[in-house]
From Swiss-Prot:
Homodimer. This is Type III pantothenate kinase. One of its GO terms (cellular component) is cytoplasm. Pathway: Cofactor biosynthesis; coenzyme A biosynthesis; CoA from (R)-pantothenate: step 1/5. Catalyzes the phosphorylation of pantothenate (Pan), the first step in CoA biosynthesis. The active site is at D85 (proton acceptor). InterPro entries: ATPase_NBD (IPR043129), Type_III_PanK (IPR004619). It comes from Synechococcus sp. (strain JA-3-3Ab). Its EC number is 2.7.1.33. Its cofactor is NH4(+); K(+).
């Protein structure tokens, strides 16, 4: 099989963005992100494997389009309403880095999801992410501005002296304090095993969490890696035309 035939696409379809991952076989070679309202288009006769985790419209069904479901992710003991993105990220983390493992996915919602040494779901937590907390203050107060987050900016002072810095301080310091508490509890239960940070805000949070644990890693593409793993398990190998 040629390298061109091995190229395929994975997509994580959310509420606000679609993240594309170009693969050559099992290797992730390129990642792109587009607004969710933009119509999905890709080269003809290219496999597309989708994880729909939001309300954005999906492409029509075709032999080239595969929409993954929670039941296709070989994570042990998931509950029925577990988010597909959480399951894919956790399973990908476990098979790539080892079990037990904990994934902190810092997206629109920030989630913590953990599995034990057998790859069985332990459970997790969901809370508003950095952007959602900032947006809530801007939307539901009369005079507080909407603040933006810069991964390269220093952590704001705890006792800020202007409104924007005070908002960043309140959100970031309380979020980090909560994550420290969750990580400490996880380590009491599972003293060994990797901890993974992923998601759009993970780049900002990771430097502040990294000193807490030697096994903490940053992997921005866990959900795409999970899609690739499921493709390996479930894809139908097409025979060349005329083959018996």
């Amino acid at each position: 099989m040629s390298s061109e035939a091995e190229r395929w696409l994975a997509a994580v379809v959310g509420n606000t963005h679609v993240r594309w991952g170009w693969f050559a076989g099992e290797s992730l070679v390129k990642v792109e992100q587009f607004p969710a309202h933009q119509p999905l288009s890709w080269p003809e006769e290219t496999e597309l494997w989708l994880a729909a985790v939001g309300s954005a419209p999906l492409p029509p069904r075709s032999p080239w389009v595969h929409c993954l479901e929670l039941s296709q992710v070989p994570l042990r003991d998931p509950y029925p309403s577990l988010g597909l993105d959480r399951a894919l990220a956790l399973w990908a983390a476990g098979i790539r880095y080892g079990w037990p493992c904990l994934v902190i996915d810092a997206g629109t919602a920030l989630t913590l999801t953990g599995a034990d040494a057998e790859g069985s779901l332990v459970g997790g937590a969901i809370l508003p992410g950095l952007g959602l907390q900032a947006q809530a203050l801007a939307d539901h107060t009369a005079r507080l501005p909407k603040v933006e987050w810069d991964p390269g900016a220093p952590i704001p002072p705890r006792w800020a002296r202007n409104t924007g810095a005070a908002i960043r301080s309140g959100i970031l310091h309380t979020l980090l304090a909560g994550l420290r508490d969750f990580l400490a509890d996880w380590r009491r239960r599972f003293p060994q095993g990797p901890l993974l940070v992923t998601g759009g805000d993970g780049e900002l949070l990771y430097p502040h969490l990294r000193p807490l644990d030697a096994e903490l890693r940053w992997d921005p593409h866990l959900v795409l890696r999970g899609i690739a793993g499921c493709r390996q398990l479930h894809r139908v190998v097409r025979k060349p035309s005329g083959a018996e």
